[in-house]
Amino acid sequence: MARYRCCRSRSRCRRRRRRCYRRRRRCCRRRRRRVCCRRYTVIRCRRR
């Protein structure tokens, strides 16, 4: 299962080994809450 998180700056995501994709307003699922991304959507993959 993949976890979705929202990021404000791409550099911050890249620093945490995450990939940032710029998309329109998209809804991400963070644990049991729904977070909306404005510009960047970060997709965190399962470790190894």
Swiss-Prot record:
Keywords, A to Z, come to: Chromosome, Developmental protein, Differentiation, DNA condensation, DNA-binding, Nucleosome core, Nucleus, Spermatogenesis
Provide one Gene Ontology cellular component: nucleosome
Does this entry carry the keyword Chloroplast?
A: no
Q: Which domain of life is it from?
A: Eukaryota
* Chief location bin: nucleus
Q: In which tissues is it expressed?
A: Testis.
The Gene Ontology biological process terms listed for this entry are: chromosome condensation; sperm DNA condensation
Its Gene Ontology molecular function terms? DNA binding
Location in the cell reads: Nucleus; Chromosome
The residues the entry assigns to the signal sequence are none
This chain's function reads: Protamines substitute for histones in the chromatin of sperm during the haploid phase of spermatogenesis. They compact sperm DNA into a highly condensed, stable and inactive complex.
Similarity comment text for this entry: Belongs to the protamine P1 family.
This protein is called: Sperm protamine P1
What gene is this protein a product of? PRM1
